[in-house]
């Protein structure tokens, strides 16, 4: 088995071998932080969108840490999520509560500047890919305790949006957003409004070093395993925000970008509605732009 596993803040020894982790033995080590050491200034270095047919390898320009892939034609299909941390054959579906599943080579993350998705369907697929970078995006795995606790992260900024999913068991995707606050949770796999539930984030906003989870099994069940995706705003690169609708045919939301948005995810929080995704591959141009929904199988 693996002797060492990378964590969000360093590494974890997974062996009792005297060469790595002997009882009361002394060791020295050197470790170098992965990835960029500064917040990104160019979105193309940390985010990529691509549309392709069937299984395909394509250039990304950076190591992919999070992949969100959806079928855009043909019969209905779930959008699926994979990460470098959990490996090439593991995935979660965004429209359901299923535990993490396996499928041989559904993703290939071990490529320096490319990515491969292994879907073998006759329909086109769209891939949205993130690379970890300070103040922009981080991805961590942790184990639940069943008691209120904090979880360390390496985002280097206060997370403004978090997606948390239990990997080991069936349960909802719990979403934190800075503008709905830590007293409420939104469910990525559901269309319901933001719900006031203190057992998800223990009514405690995240900080630049930790986020808090409550006692609910969706985020912190004893003996369960979880993955958390953390997002924050970087001027000119990414924006996490909110707005109030005006009911008119036109409303402009200023994200501070100089060349427009390539990806937009939005969800109504005060009433029932879907999680909508728009992107530049399909064309963010007019009010009739096509979209996908994260919480349904109707891509």
Model feature map: region roles:
Residues 1-299:
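Surface-exposed molecular-recognition determinants
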